[in-house]
């Protein structure tokens, strides 16, 4: 149903890939959603969870790379790392989010593919919805400023921490690409 409906859409499409995504199924979906193999048409959104990112993302990238299918790759380190705190609040741990982001970039560097984007849920407000970060929001702080009506968001400080991490990872990625170009020349 959903795949059939999306085949006729002219807009770019994002396809979520979790730890249970099978390589063969993914290739079939890519071919259905992007039958003309157009660049920019389809972005695969990896949401594996911090403990699965290396093990589960590599086979997917490898299969797509071998197939010659054109996709963009994006990391969503939020959804695969949602947990329930002992207080009952739904939360996410900064360390887990950052580990998944690092893993996403590491796998792409290893596979010589492009880490094309990241997706974060965040707010500029000083909320206490995700634990960790330099101000050490912990489970006992969650009730202080837990304002979300849906999923836990990074607060302003946590968002900046993540922005600096991504900047470092992008710089490292760019430097690796430069080294490869020099090695080939």
Per-range role (PLM):
Residues 109-185:
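Flexible, D/E/H-enriched segments
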Residues 15, 76:
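Conserved, mostly hydrophobic/aromatic
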Residues 1-4:
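Short, small-residue-biased leader/transition segments that mark boundaries at the very start
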Residues 41-73, 79-128:
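Non-transmembrane, aqueous-exposed alpha-helical and coiled segments at domain scale
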Residues 6-14, 21, 162:
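Conserved internal helical-beta-strand scaffold that buttresses enzyme catalytic cores
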Residues 8-14, 36-43:
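Short, surface-exposed connector motifs at secondary-structure boundaries
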Residues 29-35, 59-63:
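Short, solvent-exposed amphipathic alpha-helical segments in soluble enzyme
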Residues 20-30, 52-56:
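Active-site-adjacent beta->alpha loops and helix N-cap segments on the catalytic face
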């Amino acid at each position: 149903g959903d795949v059939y409906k999306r085949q006729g859409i002219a807009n770019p499409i994002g396809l979520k890939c979790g730890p249970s995504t099978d390589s063969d199924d993914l290739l079939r979906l890519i071919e259905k959603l992007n039958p003309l193999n157009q660049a920019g048409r389809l972005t695969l959104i990896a949401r594996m969870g911090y403990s699965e990112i290396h093990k589960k993302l590599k086979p997917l990238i490898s299969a797509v790379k071998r197939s010659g299918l054109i996709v963009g790759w994006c990391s969503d380190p939020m959804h695969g790392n949602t947990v329930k705190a002992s207080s009952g609040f739904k939360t996410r741990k900064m360390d887990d989010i950052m580990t998944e982001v690092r893993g996403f970039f590491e796998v792409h560097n290893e596979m010589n593919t492009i880490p094309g984007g990241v997706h974060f849920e965040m707010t500029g407000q000083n909320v206490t919805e995700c634990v960790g970060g330099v101000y050490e929001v912990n489970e006992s702080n969650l009730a202080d400023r837990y304002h979300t009506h849906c999923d836990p968001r990074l607060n302003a400080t946590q968002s900046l921490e993540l922005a600096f991490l991504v900047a470092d990872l992008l710089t490292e990625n760019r430097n690796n690409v430069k080294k490869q170009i020099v090695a080939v020349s």
